[in-house]
Amino acid sequence: MEKGLIAIGIGISMISGLGVGLGQGLAAGKAAEAVGRNPEAASKIRTMMLVGQAVAESAAIYALVISILLMFAFN
């Protein structure tokens, strides 16, 4: 019973990877559209996009760390 609940917790925490992937894809697409409309601002747009994606990726990294901790600490 307890191992099953741990497995469910690991699965739920890894669902955040799906959200992060979708969010980063949308951000990259919108950045490409913005550069297409205003090529002179490409460096500012790229910098802002990379900072935003780094912040979003940190959530996925935290979820991965939590999943690994659940997997090895409680088994």
UniProtKB/Swiss-Prot annotation:
Highest rank taxon of the organism: Bacteria
Localization per Swiss-Prot or TrEMBL: Cell membrane
Membrane topology: Multi-pass membrane protein
UniProt KW keywords: ATP synthesis, Cell membrane, CF(0), Hydrogen ion transport, Ion transport, Lipid-binding, Membrane, Transmembrane, Transmembrane helix, Transport
Annotated site location: Reversibly protonated during proton transport: E57
Molecular function terms, GO-annotated: lipid binding; proton-transporting ATP synthase activity, rotational mechanism
SUPFAM superfamilies tied to this protein: F1F0 ATP synthase subunit C
PROSITE patterns, per database record: ATPASE_C (PS00605)
Transmembrane segments: 4-24, 54-74
Cellular-component GO terms for this entry: plasma membrane; proton-transporting ATP synthase complex; proton-transporting two-sector ATPase complex, proton-transporting domain
Pfam family, one: ATP-synt_C
UniProt record similarity statement: Belongs to the ATPase C chain family.
NCBIfam families: ATP_synt_c
Subunit structure: F-type ATPases have 2 components, F(1) - the catalytic core - and F(0) - the membrane proton channel. F(1) has five subunits: alpha(3), beta(3), gamma(1), delta(1), epsilon(1). F(0) has three main subunits: a(1), b(2) and c(10-14). The alpha and beta chains form an alternating ring which encloses part of the gamma chain. F(1) is attached to F(0) by a central stalk formed by the gamma and epsilon chains, while a peripheral stalk is formed by the delta and b chains.
Function: F(1)F(0) ATP synthase produces ATP from ADP in the presence of a proton or sodium gradient. F-type ATPases consist of two structural domains, F(1) containing the extramembraneous catalytic core and F(0) containing the membrane proton channel, linked together by a central stalk and a peripheral stalk. During catalysis, ATP synthesis in the catalytic domain of F(1) is coupled via a rotary mechanism of the central stalk subunits to proton translocation.
Designated name of the protein: ATP synthase subunit c
Species for this entry: Mycoplasmopsis agalactiae (strain NCTC 10123 / CIP 59.7 / PG2)
